[in-house]
C-alpha cells in the first residue's frame, strides 16, 4: 500500500500546486472552488487506489496484461507479435505495460502481489481521473462552479 500512498500524496501535491498557481490572484470564491475540487479529486483518487489494491478486479484482464508486460520485456517489441499467444492490443499500450513490468522488477514485486496489480491498473485510474477533470472543466463553463462539482 506504500506505493499507493506515495502516488496519492504526489497527485495531491500536483493538484494543489496547479490550483494554487491558477487561482493565486483570483477571487475568494474561485480559490474556494479550487480547494473543493482538489479535495474531491483527492478523495476520488484515494478511493480508486484503495479499491485497486484491495480488489482483484477482472483477473482475466489483469493477468493477461501482466503476462503481456513480462513477454514484452523478455522477447522484445520486434518479436512479441510473432509469438504464439493471444495479443490483440496495439503496440502503444504494450510500451506502457513493459514500463510497468520494469517498475515491478525495480521494486522487486512478485507477479501475484496486490501492489503489482494496482500498478497494472494505474493507467486506467489515471485516465479515469483525467476524464473526470475534463468533464469538470467543461461542465464548469456551462453549469457554474459548484453544480459542476456534483456532476
Can you say where each PLM-predicted feature lies in the sequence?
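Start-transfer (signal-anchor) and selected internal transmembrane alpha helices
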Residues: 1-50, 140
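Hydrophobic membrane-targeting alpha-helices
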Residues: 18-22, 49, 99, 103, ...
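Juxtamembrane loop-transmembrane helix junctions in multi-pass integral membrane proteins
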Residues: 28-35, 108-118, 143
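Membrane-embedded helix bundles of polyisoprenyl
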Residues: 44, 145-151
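Extracytosolic helix-loop segments that constitute the early lumenal/periplasmic catalytic or substrate-binding loops
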Residues: 61-88, 92, 99-110
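Membrane-embedded glycan-lipid processing machinery
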Residues: 85, 89, 116-126, 151
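Transmembrane-helix motifs of polytopic, lipid-linked glycan transferases
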Residues: 118-146
